[in-house]
């Protein structure tokens, strides 16, 4: 949950100065779930908008100060709908207890609902500018940190716990080898060549994964430092790489779990919790590898993306 809370503070840093003064004027950081799916409707009124909707996946909402929610609202020209993110105090939102899951239980990602809540204009931000790294906050702060493209940053930050989970799963498997004996003998599994092969392969995969995550982080930061808007093709490529990192994290955890024997399934064994958490995390929409690859393939063929990148 910590990484989600961190990246949501970063998201708020992409807003204009007035919104950031509302949020950070009295404290240096806050907790705010970000439910960006267009599940709400925002009606323009004098001085702002009236927002109504219900959103899933409110990570951190049980400890929240504010909520960030996505809603459709008429464009300036009035001829289309645009997806915007609205910031609302938690006191004006309803938290609905829905988070009964096998993994990531501690995030408390319950549903969020608001009904006809007034949101001043400065607490609204068009998501399109945030995706490309061309937000008001990027211009306000003038640093590479806030000029990075949004979706790769969100994916990269959320991927870090998956990689950490994979590395920890391998470490737990290694510890278990010195404790388990071959069935019907006193020979420790740590003495068996097959165990050496499994451990070497799992550790090598986990090390390669960590190196890849760091390289993608450098690539994302480089776009922030470039002073250029990150193009769709590059954003799509980064999302494919991040999705592949999380999928490999999931597979490493699965393989370590399978190799650790039946004891790994006891509820007091941390390996089964890592297994549940990483498998649940891998299903997050930002890691949808099929969708990411589709967009990347379309852009490589000079076709327009048909989903956000």
Feature names for model-found ranges:
Residues 1-64:
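Glycine-rich flavin
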Residues 164, 171, 200-207, 243-250, ...:
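Generic structural signal for well-ordered, non-transmembrane alpha-helical segments
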Residues 260-309:
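Glycine-rich phosphate/cofactor-binding loops in nucleotide/flavin-utilizing enzymes
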Residues 30-33, 101-105:
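Short Gly/Pro-enriched turn/cap motifs at secondary-structure boundaries
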Residues 102-103, 109-206:
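Glycine-rich beta->alpha junctions and the first turn(s) of the following alpha-helix
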Residues 51-53, 114, 166, 209, ...:
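Buried hydrophobic positions in well-ordered alpha/beta secondary-structure cores of metabolic enzymes
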Residues 54-93, 97-98:
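DPxDG-like acidic metal-binding loop motif
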Residues 208-244, 254-265:
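C-terminal helix-coil-helix/basic helical segment that borders enzyme active sites and/or dimer interfaces
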């Amino acid at each position: 949950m910590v990484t989600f809370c961190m990246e949501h503070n970063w998201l708020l840093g992409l807003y204009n100065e007035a919104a950031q003064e509302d949020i950070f004027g009295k404290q240096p950081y806050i907790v705010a779930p970000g439910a960006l799916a267009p599940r709400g409707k925002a009606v323009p009124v004098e001085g702002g908008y009236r927002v109504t909707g219900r959103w899933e996946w409110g990570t951190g909402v049980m400890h929240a100060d504010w909520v960030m929610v996505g809603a459709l609202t008429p464009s300036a020209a009035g001829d289309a709908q645009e997806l915007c993110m609205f910031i609302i105090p938690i006191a004006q939102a309803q938290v609905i207890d829905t988070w009964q899951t096998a993994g990531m239980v501690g995030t408390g990602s319950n549903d969020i609902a608001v009904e006809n809540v007034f949101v001043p204009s400065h607490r609204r931000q068009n998501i399109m500018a945030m995706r490309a790294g061309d937000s008001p906050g990027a211009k306000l702060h003038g640093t590479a940190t806030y000029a990075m493209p949004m979706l790769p940053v969100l994916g990269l930050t959320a991927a870090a716990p998956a990689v950490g989970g994979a590395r920890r799963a391998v470490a737990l498997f290694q510890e278990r080898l010195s404790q388990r004996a071959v069935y019907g003998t006193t020979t420790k599994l740590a003495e068996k060549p097959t165990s050496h092969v499994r451990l070497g392969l799992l550790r090598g995969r986990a090390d390669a994964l960590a190196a890849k995550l760091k390289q993608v982080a450098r690539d994302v930061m480089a776009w922030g430092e470039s002073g250029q808007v990150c193009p769709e093709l590059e954003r799509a490529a980064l999302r494919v790489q991040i999705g592949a990192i999380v999928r490999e994290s999931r597979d490493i955890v699965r393989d370590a779990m399978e190799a650790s024997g039946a004891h790994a399934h006891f509820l007091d064994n941390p390996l089964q919790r890592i297994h549940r958490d990483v498998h649940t995390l891998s299903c997050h929409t930002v890691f949808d590898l099929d969708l990411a690859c589709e967009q990347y393939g379309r852009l490589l063929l000079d076709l327009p993306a048909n989903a956000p990148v």
